[in-house]
Amino acid sequence: GQAESTLNVLNIDEETKKLLDAEIICTMFEGNAPYRPRYVIPNYEVLMEKGCKFLDLDVPTDIWEATNNLLILYKHVPSITSYPVYLGNIDTLLEPFVKDEEEAYKAIKLYLKHIDRSLTDSFVHANIGPVDTKAGRLILKAMKELECAMPNLTVKYDKDITSKEFIELCASTALVTAKPSFANHKMDVE
């Protein structure tokens, strides 16, 4: 931003200045003093377990309150892009609230549509897996139906945990929507 560029808070040596001027080093047009962090990874589980006093959000009791609380909190995550980069392990966040699958599907579909229409940044990302959940299956069903660009979605695959049926559902969804991406969860947690 232009306002941040009026400040010269970084001690940049002459060699680095030349590289910046030659556009060999990219600042991503954030200015000299970005006033918001780039990557913030909120603990969304705390929101689900305790609510948020600051935003006057009670602990969610159903799928509608759970998706609504997440959508509200997403608008308050400080980020240089003005969007949250990470949306959480959305299947495990929503799984406790899947009581009626038809009702949950409607809520999850609207939740995903809202994300696609309002968090329009390619860095917006969510995870599902490695455990096969009803919420995860409903998320995949909605992603396949909506074919939304956002959020980017990754399935955390673990050959010892992830069911064959769930990973096949992920693969069939990816053939339609180019997501989820597949991550080796076991490698990530070791």
Where are these regions (language model features)?
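Conserved catalytic cores of very large enzyme subunits
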Residues: 1-190
